Amino acid sequence: MTNRWSFDVNKNLVTVLFTWLCLSISTAHAARIKDVAEVAGVRSNQLIGYGLVSGLPGTGESTPFTDQSFNAMLQNFGIQLPPGTKPKTKNVAAVMVTATLPPFSKQGQVVDVTVSSVGSAKSLRGGTLLQTFLKGLDGKTYAIAQGNLIVSGFSATGADGSKIVGNNPTVGRISGGAMVEREVPSPFGRGDFITFNLLESDFTTAQRMADAVNNFLGPNMASAVDATSVRVRAPRDISQRVAFLSAVENVDFDPADGSAKIIVNSRTGTIVVGKHVKLKPAAVTHGGMTVAIKENLQVSQPGPFSDGQTVVTPDSDIEVTEEQGKMFKFEPGLTLDDLVRAVNEVGAAPSDLMAILQALKQAGAIEGQLIII
């Protein structure tokens, strides 16, 4: 089988792109490579900075680090306060500014920023973020943020101390509030290979993806490195690499079904059961015991003109009620529908179902993973 992709820069890409369009027709259960994997090295980067928000209507703060930051800012503008002077900065707040720098961001482009108070400011509504340097993990400045905040929350305090707070007034956003000043180097144009990393690791999916790329480009063009990574040979010329990647990431293939899992959120009572979960033969009974303790206070009153004292004696009444639990039996190969139907028949609450699932897992009756989050 001949290679469908030409690595000669003097040849055009019409043939391979036509082949890509012809092979893009897929079944309803197929997925594109771009939907289940991402290109290694093509990633976003987190930025963070410390700054000041000014213009607050008395909802700012006057903490030591805010005053220090405010004085340092004035010194940068050539303003020197007299020694011992403590400015009243109730219209200023110290904030942390965060942003996400998308891959391939260029100088002059803008990104959104999130501004959050780090002191005792009551609200950032109506404030303006002053020029703040956003740095990466390497300590270099990649963007500069500044602008008016949009705050969805609100806060109001009455003269008697009563207070009403809606949403979160100490966090705001600035759309396009940071301008990119430095580009992050990308390994996209280097090397002879492009590596795709699956969003969910699976050996079968990785092998099927490599086979689909080989069927599209030719034999030995792609190989599964492990359960996450698939390496694809790519043109060295950067002008061909973009078109090459555009064709490859739109190749359709059938990912493997996920492993059998039961996800239990113990805080909210949410239970999600995968379609491949099955149960081995088991019998389950689940009952409840209610203990009610009622305190009755008995008062002993001494007679008139006596030296006795009034004594209060507690009288406890304990009542135990045990509900009769129903027993239900799981036959071999029980599916999700059967499990839900059986639990509903006994009227089990979500908390009861969690206890049942944990007991079944301990008994080895669940074919799958039980994950409690």
From Swiss-Prot:
<dbReference type="Pfam" id="PF02119">
    <property type="entry name" value="FlgI"/>
</dbReference>
<keyword id="KW-0975">Bacterial flagellum</keyword>
<comment type="subunit">
    <text>The basal body constitutes a major portion of the flagellar organelle and consists of four rings (L,P,S, and M) mounted on a central rod.</text>
</comment>
<comment type="similarity">
    <text>Belongs to the FlgI family.</text>
</comment>
<dbReference type="GO" id="GO:0030288">
    <property type="term" value="C:outer membrane-bounded periplasmic space"/>
</dbReference>
<keyword id="KW-0574">Periplasm</keyword>
<dbReference type="GO" id="GO:0009428">
    <property type="term" value="C:bacterial-type flagellum basal body, distal rod, P ring"/>
</dbReference>
<dbReference type="GO" id="GO:0005198">
    <property type="term" value="F:structural molecule activity"/>
</dbReference>
<protein>
    <recommendedName>
        <fullName>Flagellar P-ring protein</fullName>
    </recommendedName>
</protein>
<dbReference type="GO" id="GO:0071973">
    <property type="term" value="P:bacterial-type flagellum-dependent cell motility"/>
</dbReference>
<keyword id="KW-0732">Signal</keyword>
<comment type="function">
    <text>Assembles around the rod to form the L-ring and probably protects the motor/basal body from shearing forces during rotation.</text>
</comment>
<feature type="signal peptide">
    <location>
        <begin position="1"/>
        <end position="30"/>
    </location>
</feature>
<dbReference type="InterPro" id="IPR001782">
    <property type="entry name" value="Flag_FlgI"/>
</dbReference>
